[in-house]
């Protein structure tokens, strides 16, 4: 029992530390883009800033709106963080926490459940801003999960299995990002939209919704939402590296490729304005859905066609 707890602790603490320093990196990058230093006071070069932010948030009193549903209100951020950490369990970086033959389907299933934590937080806050932000987030995540699912199905047709280890062996000769670059580009843009990041951060339209679905949260519950969001960002980058960039040869290779993808996320946030909501939906349903569906049909029919030709010969 004690060893199991230690195993869980050792598996998830590096994820939370990576999340903490991703926030510091983001603030530094945005600072330099805006020709300023960013955090540089707490600790050497500002390295202790994430710890100071976390301590400040967790020692603050969590304020409950008088008209909210308290049980759902405080359960939603815990659910968000639990689901974000569950996503990491089948990832074989050093040693997977659980070995799953259907790891890709597990990832899709858990990522789709995160919609419920956002919906619960928006509804239980009993605030119009929070509810509108939650509705936007749910619509956006459901829309882009369709294209993510179709892209993964296309890759499964090419690789021939649902296990992440099979993606490693399939990329020994050439990365899937080179052979399937349209799928790779659509996948990356869809992951940005799935994690509600700029330029697809319609859920946090500050000029319209103040802060979106988490507008009524403060202190520890807000920090849990924050940790869940950045854990999802890191996980999507790790998954992108595993699926498309053949990031399985060394932990250093994984770290470098994930760092480059995270840098693209931060570059997008510093550079691009927010999409209009109708443009966001048109991109999902009128561009990505037909294209990913067509590529799925192509990738599904080609092996059948060539196997039929081989059998005839």
Curated annotation (Swiss-Prot):
InterPro entries: NADH_UbQ_OxRdtase_su1/FPO, NADH_UbQ_OxRdtase_su1_CS
Segments forming a coiled coil: none
Signal sequence annotation: none
Spans traversing the lipid bilayer: 2-22, 72-92, 102-122, 148-168, 173-193, 222-244, 249-268, 293-313
Record's keyword terms, sorted: Electron transport, Membrane, Mitochondrion, Mitochondrion inner membrane, NAD, Respiratory chain, Translocase, Transmembrane, Transmembrane helix, Transport, Ubiquinone
Enzyme Commission no: 7.1.1.2
GO cellular component: mitochondrial inner membrane; respiratory chain complex I
Subcellular localization, as worded in the UniProt entry: Mitochondrion inner membrane
Membrane association type: Multi-pass membrane protein
Reaction catalysis annotation: a ubiquinone + NADH + 5 H(+)(in) = a ubiquinol + NAD(+) + 4 H(+)(out)
Pfam families in alphabetical order: NADHdh
Function: Core subunit of the mitochondrial membrane respiratory chain NADH dehydrogenase (Complex I) that is believed to belong to the minimal assembly required for catalysis. Complex I functions in the transfer of electrons from NADH to the respiratory chain. The immediate electron acceptor for the enzyme is believed to be ubiquinone.
Record-stated family: Belongs to the complex I subunit 1 family.
Name used for this protein in its record: NADH-ubiquinone oxidoreductase chain 1
Species assigned in the record: Branchiostoma floridae (Florida lancelet)
